[in-house]
Amino acid sequence: MSQLEKCDRRSLRSQRALRQALASELAESGDLSRINVASLTERAGLTRRTFYSHYRDIPDFINQIEDGLLAEIRERVELITAAQLPDLYRNIDELEPAPGSVELLRYLAANRDLIGALLGPGGDPAFIKKIIDTSREAVVPRAQTGILGLALGTFFDYYVTYVVSAEVGMIQRWFERGLTESPETMARIMTVIAFVRPGDLYGQPIDINVPEYGMKLLNLQLEDAADTAATVESNN
């Protein structure tokens, strides 16, 4: 083994130890703002010098940790977005999870200490939004493929935001419940819920003609814009 390979392995071990120390510190203190280099390195069994050889400070450390998690999450979300609608319909009929969803949830469960701590009350409030934004970036290009033209624009933007936020919210709730359900069970729940309409729960499904609704919404936007322009002009 070359000296460079030895250094790389040592570096990876140090970073892994710091990650584990962060999860333990958060679990113990419950407050990200109380994390400091001294306590972190002491728990990891490393020197402060080792910490600063990898990170500028605690915020930089947290950002790099989160960026690594987000990259792994995005890779798995992209597997889910690659699924075709006929496959999803078949999955729902057979009560099977969407392709890629089990892999995503298994990854989250495998990193439950760190992710759970970051999502928790004393974690990083911005982390949940980062997950939503990262997932949304992965979903949008795929969701636009084959979509009805009149469903694009404002309606589509809010629709994707709603769906992604709801799915991430379920994951957050899963962590709050202590990951009681297995990744396989949770993946089945999330796959089905994505297609449930509120009225379905009460035996009164609400059918919406999306192209018609999209056209009406566009017309209302144009009318609102015209009214606003007229109001501004009259005030001048």
Q: Model segments located where?
A:
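Helix-turn-helix
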Residues: 28-61
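Hydrophobic alpha-helical connector segments
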Residues: 78-113
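Basic, helix-initiating cap at the start of DNA-binding domains
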Residues: 1-30, 34
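Alpha-helical structural segments
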Residues: 17-24, 43, 60-83, 99, ...
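C-terminal peripheral helix-coil segments that are non-catalytic and often amphipathic
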Residues: 140, 144, 156-157, 165, ...
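Amphipathic alpha-helical segments used for helix-helix packing
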Residues: 102-129, 141-142
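Amphipathic alpha-helical packing segments from all-alpha helical-bundle domains
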Residues: 122-149, 157-168, 199
